[in-house]
Amino acid sequence: MTNIRKTHPLTKIINNSFIDLPAPSNISAWWNFGSLLGICLILQILTGLFLAMHYTSDTTTAFSSVAHICRDVNYGWIIRYMHANGASMFFICLFLHVGRGLYYGSYMFSETWNIGIVLLFTVMATAFMGYVLPWGQMSFWGATVITNLLSAIPYIGTNLVEWIWGGFSVDKATLTRFFAFHFILPFIISALAMIHLLFLHETGSNNPSGIPSNSDKIPFHPYYTIKDILGALSLVLALTTLVLFSPDLLGDPDNYIPANPLSTPPHIKPEWYFLFAYAILRSIPNKLGGVLALILSILILAIIPLLHTSKQRSMMFRPLSQCLFWLLVADLLTLTWIGGQPVEHPFVVIGQLASILYFMILLVLMPITSIIENNLLKW
C-alpha cells in the first residue's frame, strides 16, 4: 500500500515541496533564509492579526489605541514589539537572501528571481504603510514625504498624490486606506511566495559551487528540515532578545510623539531598512531624478541576469568578483549610515559618491571583472 503522504492530493503537494524534495547535498546555511522568511511572514501575519483586533485606524484614536495595546491589553506590548522588530528581522533575512542570490548566481533562475523582486517591492510597500499606522510624528511626516515623491511624475503627479491621500494632505482617509492595504498585502505576499516556490521547484535549488547537482541529490527531510529548525531557533532567539532587552533600538523616538501637521521633526527619515534607498534618493538634487534613482536602486536587480558575463555561475571560484561583491556590501552599509544623517557637508558628498559607486559596481565593474576572469582562465 502506497503511503497516503504520496497519494492524497493535499499531502502530495506538501510531500513534494518539503519532504521528498530532491535537494543538492552541499547547500550551506545561506540557503536557510527562504524558510526563515516564511517564518517571519507567518509571525507578522499572526502578530498583526492580534494587533488589528485592538487598533483603530482613525486619526483621533490611532496613537492612543497603540498606547492602549501596550498598556492595557494582555501581553499587548510583546505582540506590538514582536511585530515592529519582526519587520526588522524580515528585512535582515530579505537582504541576506538577495545577497546570497547575487553571490551564488541564483538569479539565473529568471522566473524565480523576478517574482522575488516583485516580492521585495511588495514587502517594502507593506512595511512603509505599517510604519504610518501608529500615527506618531515620523509616521505622519514619513507618509507625507514619501507619498509626495509621486508628485514628481510629469503631468499627472499632483492629481495622483491627492488621489492616494484622499484629500489635500495626509489625513484620516489616508490612514484608513493604508490600514486596509497593510492588512491585505501580507496575504498577497503569501500567494506570491507560493508562486516563487513553484518556479524554484521547477528547476531545483542552486548550490554554492554553481555546478548542476542533478547527479547528487538528497531528500529535503530530514537533512534540511533539521538544518532549517536550527536557523529558525537562531532567528527566534535573536528576535526575542531584541524584543525583551531593547525593543526600541531600531525605532525612532520621534514616533512616540503624536502626529502634528503643524510641527516638522528636525530630521525626517524612514526605518533603517529603507535608509540605503533614501540616501540614493537624496543624493540627486533633482526631484524626478531622485525618484527614478530610488526605484532603479531596487529594479536594477531585474537586469542582473542580463549582465552576467562570467562563464561560471557562482562567485565561489572568482576572487576578483568576490572583492567587488564585498565592496558592494560595504557601499550599501555606507548608504544606510548616510541615509540616517542630516543633509550637511561631508554627508552629502559621501552619499553622492556611494550612490555612484553602487550603480557602477552593478552595471559596469561586475560585468567587466567577469570578462577579465574568463580571460585569466583562458575561457
Swiss-Prot record:
TM helices/strands, residue ranges: 33-53, 77-98, 113-133, 178-198, 226-246, 288-308, 320-340, 347-367
GO molecular function, one term: metal ion binding
Membrane topology, record value: Multi-pass membrane protein
Record has Lipoprotein as a keyword: no
Localization: Mitochondrion inner membrane
Organism: Enhydra lutris (Sea otter)
GO biological process assignments: mitochondrial electron transport, ubiquinol to cytochrome c
Record lineage: Eukaryota, Metazoa, Chordata, Craniata, Vertebrata
Additional observations: Heme 1 (or BL or b562) is low-potential and absorbs at about 562 nm, and heme 2 (or BH or b566) is high-potential and absorbs at about 566 nm.
Residues holding heme b b566: 97, 196
Protein name: Cytochrome b
Gene3D superfamilies xrefs: Cytochrome Bc1 Complex, Chain C
CDD domains: cytochrome_b_C (cd00290), Cytochrome_b_N (cd00284)
Pfam family, one: Cytochrom_B_C
Similarity section: Belongs to the cytochrome b family.
Note on how the cofactor is bound: Binds 2 heme b groups non-covalently.
